[in-house]
Regions:
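Phosphate- and other anionic-substrate recognition elements at nucleic-acid/protein interfaces
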Residues: 1-144
Length: 144
């Protein structure tokens, strides 16, 4: 059994929203927060986010992006990270009760998302659906 903290050099946690995305870069296996930032959810903002992560991680493509809402608000960022060569996973379900009374902010949520992925086995990661084949064709038909 190999957990994320032992097999990945970095985990990038993302709290995705309609207008902005908060990112936190954690070093594995310690979980040390290397840096945090927020970017607009625009095409230029997504490109800046991917470039920012590349600078923080030495462009190590073994880094794992853990994104909240890869099927909704985080979909475009997930696609941008995957297109850059990074592995992407959906954020694990979090225990709200464990975080009660600690505070809530987007950067803090991004950090918690990354921390929640560290002890997971790779088989427990929820991978995003691919946007290819029949799925892409149906999306085009529905949009027209």
């Amino acid at each position: 059994m190999s957990i994320v903290a032992h097999t990945r050099p970095f985990v990038i946690g993302v709290d995705a929203h309609a207008r902005t995305h908060a990112l936190a870069v954690l070093a594995c296996p310690t979980g040390e927060v290397l840096d945090e930032a927020q970017f607009p959810a625009t095409t230029a903002g997504l490109a800046r986010a991917v470039a920012w992560v590349a600078r923080r991680t030495g462009a190590d493509l073994d880094a794992l992006w853990v994104i909240e809402g890869v099927g909704t608000y985080g979909a475009r960022l997930a696609r941008a990270a995957a297109d850059a060569g990074y592995a992407v996973a959906e954020a694990p379900r979090m225990n709200a009760r464990a975080n009660r009374g600690v505070g809530k902010s987007d950067p803090l949520d991004a950090r918690r998302i990354a921390q929640a992925a560290l002890p997971l086995d790779h088989t427990q990661l929820r991978l995003p659906r691919t946007d290819e084949g029949a799925r892409a064709a149906l999306r085009i038909l529905i949009a027209s």
